[in-house]
Amino acid sequence: DQISKSKSIGVYSINDSQMNGENQNQLHTHLSDLITKHDLVIVSDYGHGFISRETAKHISKLSIFTSLNAQINAANIGYHTLNNYQNIDCVIINETELRHELRDRESDHEELMKELSKNLQSKNLVVTQGSGGATLFNSESEKYHYCPAFAGKIVDKVGAGDAMLALISCSLKSGFSPDLGLFMGSLAAAQSVETIGNSIPVNKIQLIKTFSHAVK
């Protein structure tokens, strides 16, 4: 909407067919070669055919810090699942995706987080709740960590989860505490929702200024 500068509707056309076996094997080989040159792997699985069950299993076995966002959307609901992954260091989903994964819309979300974390053998599970902020469950300490939502103006939510995924992944990989990692990710997500799509990247200087102001 050019007047309100907010997103009204999105229309997508996607080829979500699976890759053939030869291309999939090439992808696995390429991934195995790449991890020797990098510090962490960030996976965004949108459920449109690029990452098959076999590729998800291959990713799960990579000997490197790995983070995952496997989202449910209108095109893949009922077909997409997190269960193809195991031993992921950091998983980020929203509360709707959490409840869909466990087929439970009534139970307390913290209990569901603990259950899903156990099923996936994930070290850190982050669940975003829109205006309710975000919760992180660490399976090693069995503690929950909380952070409020910081967004002042919401224009478009697309990309917020990706921004949070990137910042939390880098923070946890660098040895930050779960509280600090969740805080940094939430600040990045708040920046992201203030613009249409990914038209403007998360600004490092603004992020540092906001962080400095918040901790004073």
Language-model regions: role of each:
Residues 53-144:
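Conserved phosphate/ATP/ADP-binding segment of small-molecule kinases
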Residues 123-124, 150-213:
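Conserved post-catalytic alpha-helical subdomain immediately downstream of the catalytic base
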Residues 40-43, 47, 56:
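Long hydrophobic segments that form regular secondary structure
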Residues 14-17, 97-99, 152-153:
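A short, flexible beta-alpha/helix-coil linker loop
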Residues 17-22, 33-37, 103-111, 139-144, ...:
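Short, glycine- and charge-enriched coil/turn segments that flank and shape catalytic ligand pockets
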Residues 85-91, 132-161, 208-215:
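Flexible glycine/proline-rich, aromatic-decorated loop/lid segments
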Residues 45-46, 70-72, 92-96, 102, ...:
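Active-site proximal loops enriched in glycine and acidic residues that flank catalytic Cys/His/Asp
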Residues 1-42, 62, 203-216:
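Conserved N-terminal subdomain of the carbohydrate kinase-like
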